[in-house]
């Protein structure tokens, strides 16, 4: 869910999403992935693994990847105390007495911290009603919670900070055309391979997206030459035995997406 939403978020900003990875709750794997992605890409986002339980190890793993300590962040703790709503089963909880619940909560505001950097460069509060910050490590790794509602709200809050860095803010020079097809991926693969080779020099990318359990699949054209892309519409509709649509799923009542 978060990956799909993030892909649309990137497209809306004109960000070319290069890679999505699913990493196990394994410290060595997280360290390797964080270092590699940070070295290869300008903007890296992680989702999940920052809760109170033993298997929430994103903060500690990324801290170790860059030899950083985990530091109890005073402002994050202050916001947590002010904004957290106690659950009925936690009515006996108090911040004044050490307890497993207190230690678990404090764990969520112990952040990777570089003492050589300004606080505002590495701890970002992007929503007034959320205590959870975006922890930024190595300048480009942005650590988010995995809960979709929080992930989406915080990325939306981060948008004003991202826009000044973009060559094409809000993707205004990037166009996308969607096609709905009843054919399985195997049924359009040959045509799309040929099409991709033909349009690559024009900077147009061809995509195929199976929609599991749905009646139709999606084919996309993405690029900046709108006139050229529009000239391809009839050819693509014929090649995929489908039609142009404005959004995925608008004609799900027709066709089949199953290979035979």
Regions found by a protein language model. Name each.
Residues 57-166:
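Proline/glycine-rich low-complexity loops and linkers
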Residues 239-260:
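Conserved short beta-strand edge segments in small beta-sheet-based binding/regulatory domains
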Residues 4-65, 85:
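N-terminal small/polar loop signature for handling phosphorylated ligands or for N-terminal nucleophile
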Residues 22-25, 75, 183:
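Short beta->alpha linker loops
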Residues 1:
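Glycine-rich, flexible N-terminal cofactor/catalytic loop recognition
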Residues 16-19, 116, 205:
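Conserved beta-strand segments of alpha/beta enzyme cores
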Residues 139-237:
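An accessory alpha-helical subdomain
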